[in-house]
Amino acid sequence: MQDNQPNPSPEPGSLAAGPSGRDDKNQRYWFHILAQNTHAARNLHAAKLVDKAWQQGDRVCVLCDTEEQAVELDDLLWNFTPEAFIPHSIAKAATTPCSDPVGILLYPPAAVDWDTVIVLSSALPEDADQYRRLALVAHNDPAVLNQARGHYKQLRSLGIEARVHDMRK
C-alpha cells in the first residue's frame, strides 16, 4: 500500500533538491562570526557545518593553516557525536589528494574537487569565487576577526557580497 501523502520538500542544497538554480552567487558565501573566543569553539562550529553539508550529499573540505589545527579537527570529527560517522582524512599536500567525502586540507583546494569549502585558514584562496559554496568561520578573537575582515574585502573585490552570520549579537 502506497502512502498518498505528498513528500516533504527536500532540504535546500540536498541531492534531492537538485541543482539550486540560484543565479545569485552571493547566496553561496557565508561568514560565521562566533560569540566565543576559542579555537575549540571555532573547530566545533566547523564540524557542525561539515556534518550538515556532508549529510546533504556535499563533498566537503576544511582548509587549515597547520597540521596541529588539522589534527584537532580530525579528532573532533571522529568524536563529533556518538551517532555520527563522518568519513574524512587529512591531506597535507596536493600531491596526495583526498579521496574521502570530507577532507581536511593544508593546501588550497581545487574548486572542481569540492562542493563546500570551509575556511579556517588565515589565507583565503585566490580563486575563492570559483567554489560552489564557501563558509568562513571566525571566533571572537581580534587577530582572527582582522583576518576575517581581510577575507571579506577579498571576496568583495571578486564581486561577492557574502552573508554574515554574526553570533555575537
Roles of regions detected by a PLM:
Residues 43-96:
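Short, well-structured hydrophobic secondary-structure segments
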Residues 21-42:
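Glycine-rich phosphate-binding "P-loop"
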